[in-house]
Regions:
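Active-site mouth loops of central-metabolism enzymes
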Residues: 1-4, 59-66, 141-147
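Conserved small/polar residues in nucleotide/adenosyl-binding loops
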Residues: 168-170
Length: 171
């Protein structure tokens, strides 16, 4: 509970001193890290800030259906306008036991490029698309690729998306 309060305080302080962005990472089963429900915490932070961009650094896309991520971040954009950033990564963001509890399989990360494209189409639908993400449809939510390898950087370049390099995950 204290970490949740501190996340708001840090975001407010960052806003007051002139930072442009405040992002939260998705992590599971880690004491002291309270951003397991990243979009929920971002909604809370958005309600307590007014100008700073808030976003995910990042949502581990293989843990979620792209439709649900688009709906959540579309809702955030509907509430907070162009203050929302959506960073996505392909790592599990957790340990092996929690990986299994999230119902992930080893193949989930292999689908990351297709999942990113599906996610992008929920914000900018194709003409023949049958599933529409409400309220994401037509909203400008910048999608960032997060990574620590050439794979992520290459994918971002191929899709014309911004890339955020994680220096702490490079060995």
């Amino acid at each position: 509970k204290n970490a949740l309060k501190q996340a708001v305080t840090v975001a407010q302080t960052a806003e007051q001193v002139g930072f442009n962005r405040y992002w939260l990472a998705e992590h599971h089963n880690m004491r002291g890290i309270a951003s397991t429900a990243t979009s929920v915490l971002l909604a809370h932070i958005g309600a307590h800030t007014s100008t700073i961009r808030i976003g995910s650094g990042g949502i581990m896309l293989p843990n979620h259906a792209p439709l649900v991520v688009a709906e959540q971040f579309g809702t955030l954009a509907a509430l907070y306008g162009e203050r929302i950033d959506l960073g996505v990564g392909r790592a599990p963001g957790t340990d092996g036991a929690t990986f299994r509890a999230l119902r992930r399989t080893m193949n989930d990360a292999e689908n990351f490029p297709q999942d990113v494209q599906e996610l992008m189409h929920y914000f900018d639908p194709l003409d023949n698309q049958t599933v529409i993400a409400v309220p994401a449809n037509g909203l400008n939510v910048p999608v960032w690729i997060l990574g620590s390898s050439l794979f992520g950087a290459s994918l971002a370049a191929a899709l014309g998306l911004p890339y955020a390099l994680s220096l702490i995950h490079i060995s």
